[in-house]
């Protein structure tokens, strides 16, 4: 390249002859001494190394400038395994090093060059491949490109213009490790430098007329065109042909320094030294844990004329080409070397006239490669004794094109053969061949012995586990080298164990999981045979299939095809559990092998799977899609869920078109299923966000779509990192979107992303910060949908993602949790868990129905509420089938379990059966996680890094029933985990592995026995005795917990197959002398062995040191064991007693006159264990001064009586009083001996809330400033009475500044105007009440006694500081005022954002949004901002939707109703009872209008005389009537007038308060029922009803249906939506009960009004043709430039028309181009109808048309049908249940009882 520019600038001074070109002079012989060393060590801790060093003589004869002949002889090598104080660069011979002869052939070989660049090496055919690679490494050190033959054209090239000038350039150059970029630096040496480098210039007299140059070569391993590298478990990316680096775990640096004499055209290499360093730095470590160092030095000894020739005719004919310098592979299973011939090196800058030569050479190389491939294939086939029908003679084009492909066609196509991986130790450990070839070790017998040893050692009673898990790793790796016949031999060995014995079970578990984790073709065939033969089935088979994709080594096309055939077999499709895990496993296999190709070493070994996409789509994806369609045809929810999830796991774009008809409502699917489809698209969105993002966005924009689907879609859309403008649109839309659930997701997701620091979300986080101020300021409750993404500054866990979608209860119906860690793969979290459920209410009702018998329900009398629902003829909306799933996925395992109503019934029945008898549970399993990386080192020996992390889990549980109140049993568990990181190299010539690493073991053993007694009479008592189980064979000690970290170096014989911990050559790395100690505790002992704990450590520092040693980043030698001696085992029986009790404070309480000060004045308290007296004392203390309420007591006692006499007591009591507006708590703890107490802690606290402000009286709320007070007393010491005392007092109140703002604002005037209309309880007025009661100031004071130690004072101050920080995180500004006395600490905190109450809830951060002049940016409330405070004004009218109350409420005002869902309408009741709220039977197929007892609630109202209104509240069997009598309001309970005293009225049933009636300060009444979750406030005319979230979408009446959708509030009992409020209200009027007013006429009109359907989801074009991967057919007539657009999208030509016709034909075949009418007809199914009347159950004799699940009728017509009726009995009820489950019994032969007309659908459309 730049050599023409130099114009031979040294030619004038050179006196070389024409036969001297570059480094070699024809006819001469050069002799170099060779020294090499390779060492591995954990030198992060200590300079202790293991490895080899060798020497020899390399003689080179120059036959011509382009041909060299070489020979390496007199080779010797020595082992090094010791500490080198000066590090690996110390060239002084280490101590006690013994050299021995290296077993090399010493046969001469030829080297072909071109312009000094080595192009080919030819060796004798009998020379082993490992020797070839070592010689390539040595000879490669003499390759030097002084003329830029391979230089890369760039601006940084520095060309030498004179012999005194340096040269710098980059070249792409071969070496044994690969073809990578090399930085050349050529510098002339000065006289002083020559003097300093005399050892590097052994023959300075050569070229005496020339110069000496230093040539430095620095290799860049991140820019390689070719690498010989195998990896597994790493996601290595490559851009085009450029190597993009191995991973963060491995980094490599290579520097070569060469001294030459002469000029840059003709010179002699005096010496060369290469230093290579491989650093191992896992992501869990801050710095490299160790390194592998390689040093190779060549020094010129002689230069003479050629004395004799090495080659005769026979030797020449036996030479074969081995290609360029890059590492050569061979077939490890072949009896011969059968080398893979590499291509020749072609100079990058050769002249054009040489192009034909290069082409010819390349062609010859390709031909040789093809020949070798064929030979290798046949050899591999012959080496196996088994055959496969999968074999094929067809050639792979990818293999022919890429000579790097090391897999033979037989190994790729025949899954009965072991894979060919010639870089892993067990594949090349015996002279470059698999260790199975060795006659020194019977590997099969050794594998059998390993299985037996592991089976014995995994017994819970076994002792050591340090080596067990490593033995399992060895077994797993051995299995990878075996074929199917050898697997079968091992299987027969395992089956010879005694059937039913523990040894048989353990041996089977070991072999089964080792086969699973081997991950090869023969391993798969073995598992397939187990499943087909029934040897494994059910949950066991499902586990094997679910883990298989995580462990497969080479997912070849034949492997995937075989797995595909398996999942289609009846043994899989018809088997429980397996038919779920199998398709999901196939999907994961497709994702990893076709989409995650970087997971496998395709850039070194070629594409393992097919590159084309046709087979994936045409065969596998289509199969999954067809199964999904079949699931809908069968109405099989479990199958539908399974294949939705499986399709999503593939992350293939084809799934968009599969989900399209369901997401667009063209085909019926339930809301739950469509939500699951959107979630399934999230995996594809991570791979192709620009493709899937717009689909999510369009689903979100459709406000007629279900909120679950929209919430899921918008959350996933935000995570696709959309453009800023779109994110702004979403944020702003939260102020207008009517769905609070969707808005809550947007707000929570954006707010959490604002604080994330994860690199992958950096751009998204910046966008979230920019749009956060556009988001609504509404504060949404915990029950709303949400999305949270958190960061963790931890070495292991990086982040946490949480997504919830709200449902019909407080519990979300969809929850997803993802944990990101260093083990993330393919953008997937390391751990995923979650569940989905269509309806919690249905779920729990189904469980309750199956768990408790309801046989007596049909006979008992119906309640008042049930009769009301029947009288109104409330018809439950037909609900979707109950369906749901559980999900768990990790690097170890995955599980997806879908269920429906039938599975819940089966699960409940199985659980009941299990709990009612003596049963055993037992299970064990190995789990596997590993990373592997191996590549050719610069010395020609394979470098290997492995991370193996097997885990073994075993559990045994025995249950023994001892009657209804007692049981006993045993529980044994064992968890063993080993994490071993090893790195080093393999010396193939001696089957030795030199490795360093860190071995980390963790073992947990829990063998216990227990006895349980419980009594649930008055107080609930629970007594537990638990003791260690004295296991046999445990000796004198029981090791409960073991933790060890052992850094080590070793030299290991690969044929010994021993764990490193058992190898005699293994040497732990000690950084200092090891200190051993044992610390005795009462119940256990701790043994510690470490090199980082000193003898001088005291007890306190010792514990801290032990905790420090367990830090995952500490790699020092450590062993910690927690043990029980035989004496401790006998004495370690623990006794635990727990008691729970409740006390109701009611009308008989005589403590009302005592003050609250006495609450904490217990001067003495019963201190003995399980003291009934103590519980009574605490209960009495909590109830003092309380008018009514409930007290809860929880008491725990713990002792180990045989070990020590001390016992421990913990008692907690809590009290809540609605009448007193108080919360109290009492905490007591002590340690005591049998006769005296040793230490006591007493803590009491009380929260006194401000008097309850009525929501119906703004005047009172404005006049009375709120103030909540808090007091706590802490006492501790020998006794509470004599010990230290700390008093904490606090209050939350409304500051004077805020009070002035409210009173001087327009708020009061606006409210008075509302009052003039007679409506005091409409929305704005109630919110004004809440604003008037805001708190914005907290006062905290600590009073300390004189004897309180200084540490307690520091803690008190820290509490204040923490409170400030917490408040600051929530609020914008905090003002602090501190006043300290000697024993008093006072603080006042002033909030910028007021709160509604002192502790429980915070209002939105930007409460300033509701004001017209409240600035949120104050830093303090000092004098400088006083004027700003004075200018603040509140204007509630400007902010009707900003303030959210703590609980949703419904209000009946003078002539208006304000519903739960914020719908306001006029109403006139008249003297006619109207139902404001009532529950109703939720089950559409309810057999008798049954309503659960705790949901039997109804509230009615009617106008009365004197401009008043009567209200009726029904709670179960209780009836409360609220009416106005004169100027007072009165309560009538069950027909009896009751007097409401200052402590209220309580209705107590047993020991439970059913409800309370309280008098409020403005004389209105409040009815509170915590049992039923209802609160009603009544003032004689108006009523405000608050209901818990349990009533969402579960009520009807004038208050609406409480489903968060205002447009569905006017729903009638018959599920029709009306538009006129007066007609809607009349449908809930009790017109049959002496009704006076407009209701009867309005009800008649309502019956004649048009019945509008519920607003269902409309069809919408969510997915375009392009997104679905189809030919564009949309928008043909849209726009003014159709021609250009058609041209752009391939339309408007004959080819397009033909494609379009073909597409339509294909669509018609698949049913996707059906007409709209056809689709509507397909949505019709035929079902038997059930009619219940009186004591009869009737069935239609023939099935009638009905809409498919998820569809709704678009047109109906009347149809007469015959009925067959049966008496109501068990037989008819069972038949009814069968029909409801989908059965269509044949009643055509039954007698017709009567006829009835039904409205049946003509057509149905998707909901």
Curated annotation (Swiss-Prot):
Location relative to the cell: Secreted
Compositional bias, Polar residues, is annotated for: 1700-1714
| Role according to the record | Precursor of the egg-yolk proteins that are sources of nutrients during embryonic development.
The record's principal subcellular location, in a coarse class, is secreted
At the top level of its lineage, which domain of life is listed? Eukaryota
Residues of the signal peptide: 1-16
Q: Where is the composition biased (Low complexity)?
A: 346-397
GO cellular component terms, A-Z: extracellular region
* Gene Ontology MF term list: lipid transporter activity; nutrient reservoir activity
Glycan attachment residues as annotated in the record: 354, 579, 635, 1181, 1304, 1373, 1506, 1693
* Protein name, entry field: Vitellogenin-2
- Region entry Disordered, spans: 334-402, 1635-1655, 1684-1723
PANTHER family membership: VITELLOGENIN 1-RELATED, VITELLOGENIN-RELATED
What Pfam families does its record include? Vitellogenin_N, VWD
Return the SMART domains for the record.
DUF1943, LPD_N, VWD
Q: Which residues form the Vitellogenin domain?
A: 24-819
Lineage of the organism: Eukaryota, Metazoa, Ecdysozoa, Arthropoda, Hexapoda
Question: What region holds the VWFD domain?
Answer: 1448-1636
| Entry keyword set | Disulfide bond, Glycoprotein, Secreted, Signal, Storage protein
């Amino acid at each position: 390249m730049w050599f023409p520019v130099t114009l031979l600038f040294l030619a004038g001074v050179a006196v070389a002859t024409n036969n001297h070109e570059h480094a070699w002079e024809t006819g001469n012989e050069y002799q170099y001494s060779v020294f090499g060393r390779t060492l591995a060590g954990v030198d992060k801790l200590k300079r202790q190394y293991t490895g080899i060093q060798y020497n020899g003589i390399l003689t080179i004869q120059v036959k011509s400038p382009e041909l060299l002949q070489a020979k390496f002889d007199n080779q010797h090598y020595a082992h090094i395994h010791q500490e080198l104080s000066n590090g690996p660069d110390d060239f002084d011979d280490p101590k006690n090093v013994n050299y021995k002869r290296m077993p090399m052939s010493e046969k001469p070989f030829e080297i072909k060059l071109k312009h000094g660049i080595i192009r080919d090496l030819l060796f004798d055919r009998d020379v082993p491949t490992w020797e070839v690679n070592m010689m390539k490494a040595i000879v490669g050190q003499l390759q030097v490109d002084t003329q830029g033959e391979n230089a890369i054209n760039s601006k940084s090239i520095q060309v030498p213009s004179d012999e005194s000038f340096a040269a710098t350039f980059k070249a792409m150059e071969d070496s044994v490790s690969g073809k990578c970029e090399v930085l050349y630096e050529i510098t002339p040496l000065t006289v002083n430098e020559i003097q300093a480098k005399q050892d590097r210039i052994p023959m300075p007299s050569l070229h005496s007329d020339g110069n000496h140059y230093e040539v430095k070569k620095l290799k860049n391993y991140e820019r390689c065109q070719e690498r010989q590298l195998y990896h597994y478990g790493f996601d290595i990316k490559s851009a085009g042909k450029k190597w993009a680096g191995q991973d963060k775990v491995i980094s490599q640096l290579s520097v070569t320094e060469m001294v030459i004499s002469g000029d840059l055209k003709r010179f002699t290499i005096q010496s060369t030294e290469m230093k290579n360093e491989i650093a191992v730095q896992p992501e869990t470590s801050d710095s490299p844990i160790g390194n592998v160092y390689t040093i190779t030095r060549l020094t010129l000894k002689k230069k003479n004329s050629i004395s004799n020739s090495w080659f005769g005719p026979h030797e020449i004919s036996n030479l074969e080409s081995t290609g360029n310098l890059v590492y050569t592979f061979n077939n490890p299973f072949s009896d011969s070397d059968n080398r893979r011939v590499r291509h020749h090196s072609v100079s990058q800058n050769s002249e054009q006239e040489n192009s034909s030569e290069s082409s010819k050479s390349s062609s010859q190389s390709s031909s040789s490669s093809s020949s070798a491939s064929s030979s290798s294939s046949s050899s591999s086939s012959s080496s196996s004794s088994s055959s496969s029908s999968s074999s094929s003679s067809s050639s792979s084009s990818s293999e022919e094109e890429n000579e790097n492909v090391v897999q033979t066609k037989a190994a790729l196509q025949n899954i009965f053969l072991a894979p060919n991986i010639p870089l892993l130790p067990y594949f090349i450990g015996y002279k470059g061949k698999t260790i199975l070839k060795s006659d020194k070790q019977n590997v099969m017998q050794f594998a059998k012995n390993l299985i037996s040893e592991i089976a014995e050692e995994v017994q819970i009673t076994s002792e050591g586990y340090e080596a067990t898990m490593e033995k399992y790793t060895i077994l797993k790796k051995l299995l990878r080298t075996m074929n199917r016949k050898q697997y079968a031999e091992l299987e027969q060995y395992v089956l010879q164990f005694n059937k039913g014995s523990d040894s048989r079970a353990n041996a089977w578990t070991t072999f089964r999981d080792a086969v699973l984790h081997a991950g090869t073709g023969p391993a798969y065939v073995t598992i397939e045979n187990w499943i087909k033969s029934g040897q494994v089935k059910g949950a066991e088979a499902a586990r094997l299939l679910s883990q298989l994709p995580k462990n497969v080594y080479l997912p070849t096309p034949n492997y995937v095809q075989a797995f595909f055939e398996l999942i289609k077999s009846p043994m899989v499709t018809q088997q429980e559990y397996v038919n779920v895990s199998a398709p999901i496993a196939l999907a994961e296999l497709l994702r990893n092998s076709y989409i995650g190709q970087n997971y496998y070493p395709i850039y070194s070994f070629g594409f393992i799977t097919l590159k084309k996409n046709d087979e994936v789509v045409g065969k596998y994806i289509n199969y999954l899609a067809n199964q999904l369609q079949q699931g809908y045809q069968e109405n099989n929810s479990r199958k539908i869920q399974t294949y939705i999830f499986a399709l999503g796991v593939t992350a293939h774009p084809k799934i968009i078109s599969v989900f399209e008809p369901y997401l667009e409502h063209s085909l019926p699917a339930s809301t739950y299923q469509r939500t699951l489809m959107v979630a399934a698209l999230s995996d594809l969105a991570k791979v192709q966000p620009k493709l899937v993002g717009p689909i999510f966005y369009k689903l979100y924009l459709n406000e007629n779509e279900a909120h679950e689907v929209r919430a899921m879609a918008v959350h996933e859309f935000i995570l696709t990192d959309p453009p800023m403008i779109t994110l702004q649109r979403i944020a702003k839309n939260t102020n207008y979107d009517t769905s609070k659930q969707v808005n809550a997701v947007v707000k929570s997701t954006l707010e959490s992303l604002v604080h994330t620091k994860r690199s992958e979300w950096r751009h998204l986080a910046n966008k979230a910060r920019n749009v956060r101020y556009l988001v609504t300021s509404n504060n949404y409750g915990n029950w709303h949908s949400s999305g949270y993404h958190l960061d963790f500054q931890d070495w292991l866990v990086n982040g946490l993602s949480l997504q919830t979608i709200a449902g019909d209860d407080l519990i979300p119906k969809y929850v997803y949790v993802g944990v990101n860690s260093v083990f993330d793969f393919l953008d997937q979290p390391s751990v995923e868990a979650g569940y989905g459920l269509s309806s919690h209410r249905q779920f729990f009702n189904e469980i309750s129905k199956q768990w408790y018998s309801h046989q007596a329900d049909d006979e008992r009398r119906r309640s008042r509420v049930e009769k009301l629902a029947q009288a109104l003829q409330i018809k439950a909306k037909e609900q979707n089938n109950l369906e749901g799933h559980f999900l768990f996925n990790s690097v170890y395992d995955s599980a997806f379990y879908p269920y429906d109503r039938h599975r819940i019934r089966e699960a409940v029945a199985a659980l009941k059966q299990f709990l009612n008898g003596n049963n055993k549970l037992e299970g064990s399993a190995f789990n596997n996680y590993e990373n592997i990386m191996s590549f050719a080192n610069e010395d020609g020996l394979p470098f290997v890094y492995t991370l193996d992390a097997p885990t073994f889990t075993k559990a045994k549980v025995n249950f023994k029933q001892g009657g209804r109140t007692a049981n006993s049993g045993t529980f044994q568990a064992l968890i063993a985990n080993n994490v071993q990181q090893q790195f080093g190299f393999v010396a193939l010539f001696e089957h030795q592995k030199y490795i360093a690493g860190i071995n980390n073991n963790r073992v947990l053993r829990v063998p216990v026995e227990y006895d349980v007694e419980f009594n649930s009479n008055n107080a609930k008592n629970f007594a537990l005795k638990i003791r260690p189980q004295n296991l046999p064979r445990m000796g004198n000690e029981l090791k409960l917990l073991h933790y060890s970290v052992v850094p080590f170096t070793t030299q290991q014989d690969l044929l010994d197959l021993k764990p490193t911990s058992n190898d005699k050559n293994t040497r732990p790395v000690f950084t200092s002398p090891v200190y051993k100690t044992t610390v005795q505790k009462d119940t256990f002992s701790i043994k510690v062995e470490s090199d980082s704990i000193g003898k001088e450590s005291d007890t306190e520092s010792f514990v801290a040191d032990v905790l420090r040693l367990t830090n995952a980043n500490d790699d020092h030698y450590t062993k910690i064991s927690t043990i029980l001696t035989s004496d401790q085992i006998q004495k370690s029986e623990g006794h635990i007693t727990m008691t729970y009790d409740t006390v109701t404070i009611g009308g008989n309480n005589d403590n009302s006159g005592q003050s609250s000060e006495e609450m904490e004045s217990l001067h003495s308290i019963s201190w003995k264990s399980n003291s009934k007296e103590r519980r009574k004392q605490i209960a009495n203390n909590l109830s003092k001064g309380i008018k009514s309420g409930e007290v809860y007591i929880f008491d725990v006692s713990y002792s180990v009586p045989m070990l020590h006499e001390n016992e421990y007591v913990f008692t907690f009591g809590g009290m809540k009083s609605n009448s007193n507006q108080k919360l109290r708590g009492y905490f007591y703890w002590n340690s005591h001996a049998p006769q005296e107490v040793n230490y006591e802690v007493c803590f009491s606290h009380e929260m006194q809330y401000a008097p309850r402000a009525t929501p119906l009286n703004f005047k009172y709320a404005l006049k009375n400033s709120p103030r909540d007070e808090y007091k706590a007393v802490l006492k501790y010491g020998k006794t509470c009475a004599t010990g230290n005392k700390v008093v904490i007092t606090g209050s939350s109140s409304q500051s004077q500044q805020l009070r002035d703002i409210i009173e001087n604002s327009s708020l009061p005037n606006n409210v008075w105007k509302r009052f003039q209309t007679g409506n005091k309880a409409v929305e704005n007025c109630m919110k004004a009440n809440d604003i008037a009661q805001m708190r914005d100031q907290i006062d905290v004071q600590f009073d300390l006694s004189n004897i309180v130690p200084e540490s307690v004072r520091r803690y008190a101050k820290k509490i204040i500081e923490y409170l400030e920080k917490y408040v600051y995180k929530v609020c914008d500004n905090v003002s602090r005022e501190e006043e300290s006395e000697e024993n008093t600490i006072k603080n006042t905190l002033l909030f910028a954002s007021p709160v509604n109450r002192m502790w429980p809830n915070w209002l939105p951060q930007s409460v300033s949004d509701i004001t017209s002049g409240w600035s949120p940016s104050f830093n303090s409330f000092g004098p400088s901002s006083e004027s700003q405070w004075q200018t603040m004004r509140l204007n509630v009218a400007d902010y009707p939707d900003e303030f959210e109350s703590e609980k949703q409420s419904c209000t009946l005002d003078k002539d208006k109703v304000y519903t739960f869902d914020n719908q306001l309408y006029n109403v006139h009741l008249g003297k006619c009872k109207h139902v404001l709220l009532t529950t109703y039977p939720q089950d559409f197929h309810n057999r008798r209008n049954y309503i659960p007892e705790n949901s039997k609630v109804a509230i009615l109202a009617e106008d009365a005389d004197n401009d008043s209104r009567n209200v009726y509240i029904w709670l179960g069997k209780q009836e409360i009537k609220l009416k106005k009598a004169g100027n007072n309001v009165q309560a009538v309970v069950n027909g009896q007038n009751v007097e409401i005293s200052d402590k209220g009225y309580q209705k107590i049933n047993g020991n439970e308060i059913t409800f309370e009636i309280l008098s409020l300060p403005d004389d209105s009444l409040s009815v509170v029922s915590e049992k039923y979750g209802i609160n009603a406030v009544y003032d004689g005319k108006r009523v405000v009803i608050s209901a818990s979230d349990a009533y969402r979408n579960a009520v009807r009446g004038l208050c609406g249906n409480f489903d968060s959708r205002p447009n569905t509030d006017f729903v009638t009992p018959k599920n029709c939506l009306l538009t006129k409020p007066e007609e809607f209200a009349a449908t809930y009027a009790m017109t049959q009960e002496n009704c006076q007013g407009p209701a009867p006429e309005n009800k008649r009109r309502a019956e004649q009004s048009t019945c509008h359907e519920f607003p269902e989801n409309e069809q919408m074009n969510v997915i375009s043709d392009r997104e679905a991967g189809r030919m564009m057919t949309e928008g043909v007539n849209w726009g003014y430039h159709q021609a250009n657009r058609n041209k752009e999208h391939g339309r408007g030509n004959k080819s397009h028309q033909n494609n379009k016709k073909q597409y339509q034909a294909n669509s018609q075949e698949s049913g996707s181009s059906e007409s709209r009418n056809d689709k509507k007809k397909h949505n019709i199914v035929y079902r038997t109808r059930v009619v219940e009347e009186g004591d009869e159950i009737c069935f239609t004799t023939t099935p009638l048309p009905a809409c498919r699940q998820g569809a709704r009728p678009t047109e109906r017509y009347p149809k007469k049908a015959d009925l067959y009726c049966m008496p109501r009995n068990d037989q008819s009820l069972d038949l009814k249940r069968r029909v409801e489950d989908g059965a269509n019994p044949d009643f055509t032969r039954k007698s017709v009882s009567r006829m009835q007309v039904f409205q049946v659908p003509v057509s149905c459309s998707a909901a």
